[in-house]
């Protein structure tokens, strides 16, 4: 349920936003939430109850400010007796006035924003005090390099995320 360099915010060009969102939501329903020792599980619990409470607090705050939940939680089977098993969630209609989009939520949830162009995306990507990891998804390597050079981040990926190279030092 948690990854130190997992995707937290997604900015999508308005030209492909609707198609992207439909596919992303569809893929989110493929997660199998459960005991990480079970073979079919591909989404486990968050580390502790206080982490689950923090994640839910940030999501609920965003929802109270107008964010829209895209995932129907009733379509997931999960161990209800364990509150640290969080259903994955996709939030839209999010803004940077929401802590969900500017702080590290660190859970199985993501905010997706429509942007007009790469300049707006870069501005929003840099609107974070952390600048830990960024990932650009494109077919054009020159655009990825151009954006990557403008993003204030310690780690930059093209067409991948949360990847560790054994040749590089990584402390999480």
Model-predicted regions and their roles:
Residues 2-9, 25-57, 74-85, 102-107, ...:
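Flexible, acidic loop-helix segments that line cofactor/substrate-binding pockets
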Residues 9-16, 90:
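Short beta-strand and adjoining strand-loop segment in the mid-core
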Residues 1-3, 15-43, 57-73, 93-100, ...:
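Glycine/threonine-rich helix-loop capping motifs at alpha-helix boundaries
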Residues 4, 12, 139:
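Glycine-/small-residue-rich active-site loops that bind phosphorylated ligands and cofactors
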Residues 78, 85-172:
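Conserved C-terminal structural/oligomerization subdomain of aldehyde/semialdehyde dehydrogenase
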Residues 14, 45, 111:
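Conserved donor-binding loops in enzymes that form glycosidic bonds
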Residues 14, 18, 53, 60, ...:
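Residues in well-ordered alpha-helical elements
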């Amino acid at each position: 349920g948690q990854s130190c360099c997992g995707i937290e915010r997604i900015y999508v060009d308005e030209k492909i936003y609707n198609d992207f969102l439909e596919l992303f939501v569809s893929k989110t329903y493929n997660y199998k939430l459960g005991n990480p020792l079970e073979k079919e599980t591909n989404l486990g619990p968050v580390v502790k109850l206080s982490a689950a409470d923090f994640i839910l607090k940030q999501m609920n705050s965003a929802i109270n400010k107008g964010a829209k939940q895209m995932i129907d939680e009733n379509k997931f089977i999960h161990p209800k007796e364990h509150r640290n098993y969080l259903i994955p969630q996709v939030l839209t209609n999010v803004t940077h006035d929401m802590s969900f989009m500017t702080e590290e939520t660190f859970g199985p949830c993501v905010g997706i924003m429509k942007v007009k162009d790469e300049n707006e995306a870069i501005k929003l990507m840099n609107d974070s005090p952390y600048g830990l990891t960024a990932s650009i998804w494109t077919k054009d390597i020159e655009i990825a390099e151009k954006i990557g050079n403008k993003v204030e981040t310690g780690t930059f990926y093209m067409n991948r995320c949360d990847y560790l190279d054994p040749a590089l030092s990584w402390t999480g």
